[in-house]
Amino acid sequence: MSLARLRVHHLRNLESVDIEPSSRVNLIYGLNGSGKTSLLEAINVLALGRSFRSHKHKPLISHQQLAFTIFGRVLADDAAEIPIGIQRNQQGEVMLKANGANVGSIADLAIFLPVQVINSDTFLLLEGSPKVRRQFMDWLVFHVEHQFYPQWKSLQRCLKHRNSLLRRDRIDPFELSTWDQELVQLTEQIHCFREQCMALFVPVFEQLLQEFVVLEGLELHYQRGWDKHKDYAQVLQDSFERDKRLGVTHAGSHRAELRITLNGQDAAEILSRGQQKLLVCALKIAQGLVFSQVTGRKCIYLVDDLPAELDEQHRQRLVDWLYRMDTQVFITGVERQALLAGWLDKPEITPKMFHVEHGRVSCPA
């Protein structure tokens, strides 16, 4: 799986870009503010319909333009070429296409281009809210279990209706029972999907971590979001009065968590900044490995400002793992030589260089 061509129009300071990346290593250099991160951002938007820098769509559209357009030609692992594209205007209206036909949702587009991002925000995986870690888990579940996303969407709809019902002055017991039954079924299915994926993920991560950083006593704990000793139906019944008082469903798979601890304590509170970065890199690489093992496909890695995020020794470890995964990578940095340094001991790899200056992308000889 690789991105064979990328065309970007009117995204931030990228007015018009048309490149043909290498199927392996792509190194993007340029001064801060030149647009190199925006190039990675364009790939992420093409893959997921959203930016890794902002949840708002308007800042993505170039000044005085009506919309941005991103087109990609994906080379699948079976050598088939799949054209995909996204356009979003100032009003937020979006047009999605794959293989020349309109696509109904971002989820339908996302299956064509699985990407992993490693940047400064990635380290929120440890420090951020449980939602960040749920999203991390669910990336893998989404890509390996195709029934997950429809079930997840149904769960969100069910929670919305149940919470609305809880806020009424008078609650119809039959209506509550109907929503509770559906919620129980969906919640248990979502939990099953996550539990199965984490059972695959954890041993791969634990083995991989030793090559990044030795952290004796580090553990991952998948927590399903309600008392593991109780059936979810019983939990809903027991917590009804509190849920009604506060107008929200407290327990369930929407409150699941991936706890990362060191000797029983929150790892984010104990580890140094450098150790945290290495831990997160191991999490991201392990996720790509499990994805490949289960699906037989490979994901694309977008690594922003690598020289600034890791010291030379640990930067080399990440580069070595990206090399071993035999997948497509896009890595940005300010200095050309600093980016190239990690690949000098790999003569069979010839990185493709891209220089970004004032939103213009060139491919120097």
From Swiss-Prot:
A GO CC term assigned to this protein in UniProt: cytoplasm
Molecular function, one GO term: single-stranded DNA binding
Keyword GTP-binding: no
Swiss-Prot/TrEMBL keywords: ATP-binding, Cytoplasm, DNA damage, DNA repair, DNA replication, DNA-binding, Nucleotide-binding, SOS response
Family annotation (InterPro entries): DNA-binding_RecF, DNA-binding_RecF_CS, P-loop_NTPase, RecF/RecN/SMC_N, RecF_2
Record-level GO BP terms: DNA replication; DNA synthesis involved in DNA repair; double-strand break repair; SOS response
Keyword Nucleotide-binding annotated: yes
Subcellular location: Cytoplasm
Residue numbers binding ATP: 30-37
Known role: The RecF protein is involved in DNA metabolism; it is required for DNA replication and normal SOS inducibility. RecF binds preferentially to single-stranded, linear DNA. It also seems to bind ATP.
Protein family (similarity comment): Belongs to the RecF family.
Protein name: DNA replication and repair protein RecF
Gene: recF
